[in-house]
Regions:
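Terminal and domain-boundary accessory regions
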Residues: 2-234
């Protein structure tokens, strides 16, 4: 970045005194190299998801279900776990695929959906906690997701850890732990454009790449229940 210092004569009075000159800094625009997968400024979903950063690697996938699900809904679509795992299987060698979800007691629809598509579902109960303004629904899964990811890092032989979440604080915490304990493991994030922290593609010291979810890994909102099991979806 360059700066040019220009001294300009100015007869305006500043703070009650006559200014003999005003120092003006003019900065030339800085050109930044983009990180692989950096989403477009518009926040729109690309047509295709670029998984080239996973090519041939042993990959462990961990997903923050609430984050990617809500992010996809904002884009008027649904995130497809089945399509993602199919694509990763073609590009790489998935070792584990875990999604952390929350569900009310007796509601196993989301769990069935994930397990029939090759994912392991870690189900946390939706709990009401007392707050200053009365009871509130508690659905934060960050601690459990971080713990499960730490277990994966300590017990599996992988080249890449793929975090499916746009939560910057969560992903940074996991990436720092991976850098401390498994420095050879590359940490890659996948998130929905418009619902992803800028840190995911700017912190090149922690993340090897960021993958912007494309429409090829989504389903329309008006999906239909499966004929064989009304609690699962096509």
């Amino acid at each position: 970045m360059t700066s040019r210092f220009l001294l300009q004569k100015n007869s305006r009075r500043l703070h009650g005194g006559l200014a003999k000159g005003v120092a003006v800094f003019r900065r030339t625009p800085k050109t930044c190299k983009t990180m692989p997968g950096e989403p477009a400024p518009s926040g729109q979903l690309p047509a295709a998801t670029d998984l080239s950063s996973l090519q041939g690697a042993r990959v462990a996938l961990v997903a923050d279900d609430e984050n990617v699900r809500i992010g996809a809904l904002r884009q008027q679509c649904r995130f497809s776990y089945g399509l993602l795992l199919d694509r990763v299987t073609k590009e790489a060698k998935p070792v584990a695929a875990i999604a952390v979800i929350t569900a009310a007691p007796g509601d196993d629809g989301r769990q069935n959906y994930l397990e029939t598509r090759g994912w392991q579902a870690l189900v946390l109960p939706r709990e009401q906690h007392a707050g200053a303004n009365g009871p509130r629904l508690y659905t934060n899964v960050d601690t459990d997701l971080g713990t499960e990811t730490g277990y994966l890092l300590g017990t599996t032989s992988i080249d890449v850890l793929l975090i499916c979440s746009g939560d910057g604080d969560l992903c940074l915490s996991i990436a720092r732990a991976a850098a401390r304990h498994r420095p050879k493991v590359r940490v890659v994030t996948l998130a929905v454009p418009g619902s992803a922290s800028h840190q995911l593609w700017r912190r090149r010291d922690l993340f090897a790449a960021h993958i912007a979810l494309g429409r090829d890994l989504t389903r329309p909102l008006n999906r239909q229940p499966s004929a064989s099991n009304p609690k699962t979806y096509v």
